[in-house]
Amino acid sequence: MEEKLKKAKIIFVVGGPGSGKGTQCEKIVHKYGYTHLSTGDLLRAEVSSGSARGKKLSEIMEKGQLVPLETVLDMLRDAMVAKADTSKGFLIDGYPRQVQQGEEFERRIAQPTLLLYVDAGPETMQKRLLKRGETSGRVDDNEETIKKRLETYYKATEPVIAFYEKRGIVRKVNAEGSVDNVFSQVCTHLDALK
């Protein structure tokens, strides 16, 4: 099973809040048959499952602490192993947020094939998030919080992009355009992997 993961196509998907990376991931799953894994979704699913690990996670998150990297990686690996036979590849969404997370992923799971950087400017992301806030009811979609989230995102992501750029596996997608325009750029990069 470990061998299968080492041979699998693994794509880290990085993009700011409001960059549209969630939408792009959905489209990739639909067209290419990849498995979309979001660390946030995995954590939430584990907590609501009521498992021993879920209970521990719930306590950590309630205290506002960060979930240990080891736990996140265990969950990612479990999810990947479960799909290794049927999946055409894996989209790892919102990970790594730090260089160390990327290094640990490689040590414990496998090397990424590509890092897909869904890149939209801060004004675009802010506009999209404010628009989403009108309908989503998400508490973190207001102007003040959005500015903070974008700052945090840029600080965390720049070193990660730089780290993988040195290896030549970053594929940048201009996410300013329409969903379809962005997706056609994504397809160009993914088709080149075959």
Swiss-Prot record:
One of its GO terms (cellular component) is cytoplasm. Its cofactor is Mg(2+). Residues 131-141 are annotated as: LID. Coiled coil: none annotated. The modification Phosphoserine is found at S38. Consists of three domains, a large central CORE domain and two small peripheral domains, NMPbind and LID, which undergo movements during catalysis. The LID domain closes over the site of phosphoryl transfer upon ATP binding. Assembling and dissambling the active center during each catalytic cycle provides an effective means to prevent ATP hydrolysis. PROSITE patterns: ADENYLATE_KINASE. Monomer. It is found in: Cytoplasm. Keywords: Acetylation, ATP-binding, Cytoplasm, Kinase, Nucleotide-binding, Phosphoprotein, Transferase. One of its GO terms (molecular function) is ATP binding. GO terms for biological process: ADP biosynthetic process; AMP metabolic process; ATP metabolic process; nucleoside triphosphate biosynthetic process. ATP binds at G18, S19, G20, K21, G22, T23, R132, G177. This is Adenylate kinase isoenzyme 1. It comes from the Eukaryota. It holds the Pfam family ADK.
